[in-house]
Amino acid sequence: MKLSKNNRHTRNHHSALSNGATVLFLLAFGVNYHGFAANAMMANPRPFTETQPDGQLIRLRLNGDPYDAWTSDADGYTVVRDPITGFFVYAEEDGNGGLQPSHDLVVPLDDNGSRRLASESKNRKKHLRPSKRDCSQMICGDNERRSKLPLLGRNLRGYRSNDHGLNDTDDDLKTFNIFNITRPQFQDSSDDDNGNGRRLRTTGTLRNLVVLLKWEDHADRPVPSPQDIDVLMNHDGPHPLAPTGSVRTVFLENSYDSLQLESTITDWVVVNNTEHYFANGNGGRSSVIWEAIEYALHYLDDNDLVDFDYFDEDQDGQIDCITFLHSGYGAEFGGTDQYGAFWEDRLWSHKWALYVDPFVSKSGVQVMEYHISPSLWGRSNSKIGRIGVIAHETGHFLGVPDLYDIDGGGIGVGCFDLMANSWGFDGRQYYPPQMSAWTKLLLGWVVPYFPSPGENQIAAFQLRDASL
């Protein structure tokens, strides 16, 4: 059966905030956004336990994101696995801009203090990382992305009066100038920028195709059914599979009922290689993952399983919104999963683009940008994935950048924005934060309110729908 308007999922959804009071505070923080399409989920903030080959238990932590990920001990010293011995050891510089294993084992959990003292006497640097990497076909750190990756992404969306009720008035410009926001420039899809300049719908109904990818070596693994994924993506209100609401609910709440994300779920597509292959030893941070994306899209198109025209409602020749969910555990959880795969041999959730060879359906609909997340939660069992990561990556698809720290020196805006802490206050991804007023302003979901010059009389508490 071809997925199209004749069998799409339709529901009457109501925002959990539609009858409640919401007060927004606009934080005056500066955000650097370089227009690249590569964005991703931050690492699991919780530490994890690994077992050394000799049975010793050690406590490690995954840091960063796909651009720049590294493993450290509880004190922040970089750890690598020795490929010869299999032991986790402290990293050291190799003299050529890279890292190599030292001979010092990571301090175990049951250490009496002697090993720790011996380790600290080495005067190691915390958060040690390679200074040189080949980023020509890989998601890398911020500076390397800026200088070496092609310009993939659309700029943050500019405002137009017919879309958001904002004109190029003094007040509108003041909104951006007061808070040191660089106003985004609108780019039409006709611009010569590999098709990435187009603007996504942020009001009304946004049709989202959800493609389920099963790695070749996962053919017999238990995974959520398409019907279960439909609950995760579309359900109205709490459900045992999505106890705090669905991904659709997240965007209804954040947009004050302005954006209705309508997701249509495919059956599982078994791709033509293994999880280990597509992860490529670096958490799927290289262009090898594009092979899986392309394979699944061609399979769906060649077998007439998806009406791609239906997902190009604005008829600009590009799919309106697309989500990929895979059959493995997310690399961003760190550690080793129940099947023995370390995080580097799993896929890290991210949003990127097929900028070398975009997919084009038989009817002429192009898929350039995509985002991908795990369908499973954690590192073991077959529990369905959660809304935090999918909502975060969908936010990127709408054009919002990451707002978390990427160099280990801080936490960015932290719990004040979905794009900074999609794990939520308890790390379970059931309670991802609301988007900040800054983000909602960029997406056209709030309208700035300016007090008049001079003295203003204001109520101690005032409700203003979709206002700052």
Regions found by a protein language model. Give the residues of each.
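C-terminal segment of classical bacterial N-terminal signal peptides
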Residues: F29-A37
